[in-house]
UniProtKB/Swiss-Prot annotation:
Gene: tmk
Protein name: Thymidylate kinase
Native organism taxonomy: Bacteria, Pseudomonadati, Campylobacterota, Epsilonproteobacteria, Nautiliales
Pfam families the UniProt entry points to: Thymidylate_kin (PF02223)
Species of origin: Nautilia profundicola (strain ATCC BAA-1463 / DSM 18972 / AmH)
Reaction equations catalysed: dTMP + ATP = dTDP + ADP
Source organism, top-level taxon: Bacteria
Amino acid sequence: MYIALEGIDTAGKSTQIELLKNEYKNNILFIKEPGFTKFGTKIREIIFNDDISKKAELFLFLADRAETIEKFVKPNLHKNILTDRSVISGIAYAMEFFDFNMLVNLNKFATDGIFPEFVIILKLDKETLQYRLSQKNHDNIEKRGLDYLINIQDNMIEVCNRLEIPYLLLDASKNIEEINFRIKKVISEYMDID
C-alpha cells in the first residue's frame, strides 16, 4: 500500500513522520519529496534557495519525483510505503501557475502512472497557519504568502477529488497525539502491519 501524508508547510507532517518512523520502522518504507535521493537533495537545495522560474521549478520537482519513484517506490510496491509529500502536493502547488490536465500528464509520465493509493491531508485554518509561519524562517515557497498556502491546501483536496484518490482530511491544529492516533488508525486499516 502506497500512502501519502500531505499538508502545507507547518501543518506538522515532519513531526508525524518522525513519530511514525519510531513505531513502524520495520514495517513501512518512509520516503519524502523532494530530496529523498542523493540527486533529490541537490534539487531540493535549488528549489528552496535559488531564484528560478516557475517552469524550471516544476521540472525540478518532476525530476525528483521520477527518480524517487524509479529507485524506491517501484521496487517496493509490494511493501508498505508512506511518503512525506507526493504527486498530490506537486500538482496542488503547480496548478496555481499551470493547467491541471497538463500537470497530471507530466506527472503520469514522471511516475509511470504510479500515484498514492490513499492520501492523508493535514489541514490548517488560516489563523493557526499565520501563527506557525510567524515562528520560523521562510523558504522560497513559504514566501509566497498566507493566501497562497491556503489555496494550495484547497488544491490538494481538489487534486484528490479529480484524480479519484481516496483521502482523509485531518485538522492539523489538533494536538500531536490526537493527529498521530488518527493516522495510525488509517495505517492499521490500509496497511498489512505485522
